[in-house]
Amino acid sequence: LFTSNYGRLAMLCTVGNIPTVILGIFFRQLAEELATNILAVGMGFLITAIFLLVAGVIQQGTKTPQDLTWWQILLLGICQGCAVFPGVSRFALVLCLLILFGQTQKSSIRCAVLMQVPVLLGAFVYTVRDLFSNGNIAVTAVAMLLCILLSALTSCFLIRTMLKRIHKRSFLGFSLYCVL
């Protein structure tokens, strides 16, 4: 099952997200407190810029997700978990690490996007659960579903557009944007 590229991607998304979930739950409170600290957010953007800069200058590898080891997958999950802090890009950290592991740029981008989907869905469910448990919600279910649908469609469009552009350009522009 885990010998094909798709099987390896499934394992990456499953096993790689275990440390992410643990770090996300453990550091949630601290991350929420740091979100109001402009210096902490700025440091997060600086970290993102450095990772993108490194990813942009490293020679592209030839490996595929099939070549990832268990340790590399767990390290990807830990890196992704560090993105709970404000300003730190989950995508940039995972992308840079995959490129450092010798993955092709195309497979690195695909893995980085796919790896964050379960985390984002889990965070969404976690947040909605908190929202409803507080009883302070004044939005109808229909309005919320429409917002979710619109957000999902917009996200798919933006991800697709970003993936097309990122194949053609370097990460330098976004790295500079993060610094500014």
Regions found by a protein language model. Name each.
Residues 1-180:
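Multi-pass membrane proteins that catalyze or facilitate reactions on polyprenyl-/lipid-phosphate substrates
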